Amino acid sequence: MPVDEVVKEEAIEDCKNVMNQMKVIYQKADKGTSSNIVVSETVMEEMQEVLKEKNVPVITSAPYSNMANYSKMEEFLFRAEQDLTGDIVLYRINRDGGIERLKFNYDGTDMFHYCLRNYYIR
């Protein structure tokens, strides 16, 4: 499905801003010596706290991770059940310290999902 250029640019700019907010945490984190970077659950939780303060839904890829600001996602899904249009962005912090921006859009009939994944280059 083609993505509108405005939506695409908005997602890219949003991800750049989020990655810049996480940069200091990522740079200080112990990433090990392997070529496959893995940050600790503590680092992922620290990154989650930064986004939590922005009042957006955010989850980490750690097992049994809780979604911060889950009520925002619940509200969006409840409205979709009522056939009310809307959208929401969920962020997922991955083991490599990268961030996924998952945008869900409900148009009253269909649900669309746009995903953009960012990661740091060593």
Predicted regions and their residues:
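Mature, Sec-exported extracytoplasmic domains of Gram-positive
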Residues: 1-122
